[in-house]
């Protein structure tokens, strides 16, 4: 059960994250433990995606961002990359009607121009179908990298300066943020990483500046609503400072 009975219902909105981002790690190791190829683990991970989406929708989380394919993943074996691309198409084809039925809005962030025309078409059609939905905002980060995101923002600002539509002294943190992916959504409150690793892996470098982190040894295909609930409960107990401090007389250990 999320939180305890000590919390009044009207306090829940301030304790629960509005935006959760997940680094879905461990598919390959999950498959290896079962004597299978990595592709088997990636396919098994779809069930965990369903669980994460369902949990988020049920608990009124506004945005869920899933790290599906990083810009560095192109360095994996060609057969695995090809399998991932086909799995992406399969997932879109099999899940989009359900997402639409449940009022979930889909967005894909990243440099999708490197994908095949077939995959790009599936992405555009899926995003268009759900564009007017008003429930959970589901973001899939595909061919995405945090550094790439910052660079593309800077490039757009540089073009404005070149076009004489922006003065250099007018560049602010807010302006840079406006050109970043997810800028129109709540800031990321909680980052969950499965698989036991404790690193960011070039994910949402700008957007997670004040996020809380939750690491679990659970491999992604085994991620379910109970694991998600544990992360949310841990988040609710955190003292978020956003770069500030707390009073010296506060009853804390730091």
From Swiss-Prot:
It comes from the Bacteria. Its EC number is 2.5.1.31. PROSITE patterns: UPP_SYNTHASE. Signal peptide: none annotated. Substrate binds at residues 26-30, 38, 42, 70-72, 74, 76, 193, 199-201. Mg(2+) binds at residues 25, 198, 212. Catalyzes the sequential condensation of isopentenyl diphosphate (IPP) with (2E,6E)-farnesyl diphosphate (E,E-FPP) to yield (2Z,6Z,10Z,14Z,18Z,22Z,26Z,30Z,34E,38E)-undecaprenyl diphosphate (di-trans,octa-cis-UPP). UPP is the precursor of glycosyl carrier lipid in the biosynthesis of bacterial cell wall polysaccharide components such as peptidoglycan and lipopolysaccharide. This is Ditrans,polycis-undecaprenyl-diphosphate synthase ((2E,6E)-farnesyl-diphosphate specific). It comes from Photorhabdus laumondii subsp. laumondii (strain DSM 15139 / CIP 105565 / TT01) (Photorhabdus luminescens subsp. laumondii).
């Amino acid at each position: 059960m999320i939180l305890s009975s000590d919390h009044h219902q009207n306090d829940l909105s301030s304790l629960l994250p509005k935006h959760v981002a997940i680094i879905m790690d461990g598919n390959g190791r999950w498959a290896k433990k079962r004597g299978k190829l990595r592709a088997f683990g990636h396919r098994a991970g779809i069930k965990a995606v369903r669980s994460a989406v369902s949990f988020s929708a049920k608990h009124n989380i506004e945005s869920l961002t899933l790290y599906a394919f990083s810009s560095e993943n192109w360095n994996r074996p060609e057969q695995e990359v090809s399998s991932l691309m086909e799995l992406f198409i399969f997932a879109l084809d099999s899940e989009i009607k359900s997402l639409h039925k449940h009022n979930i809005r889909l967005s894909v962030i990243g440099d999708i121009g490197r994908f095949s025309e077939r995959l790009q078409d599936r992405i555009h059609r899926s995003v268009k179908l759900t564009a007017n939905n008003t429930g959970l905002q589901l973001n899939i980060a595909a061919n995405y990298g945090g550094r790439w995101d910052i660079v593309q923002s800077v490039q757009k600002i540089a073009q404005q300066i070149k076009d004489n539509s922006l003065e250099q002294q007018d560049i602010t943190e807010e302006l840079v943020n406006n050109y970043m992916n997810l800028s129109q959504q709540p800031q990321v409150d909680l980052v969950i990483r499965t698989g036991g690793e404790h690193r960011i892996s070039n994910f949402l470098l700008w957007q997670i500046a004040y996020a809380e982190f939750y690491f679990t040894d659970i491999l992604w295909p085994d991620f379910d609503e109970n694991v998600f609930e544990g992360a949310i409960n841990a988040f609710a107990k955190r003292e978020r400072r956003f770069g500030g401090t707390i009073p010296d007389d506060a009853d804390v250990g730091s």
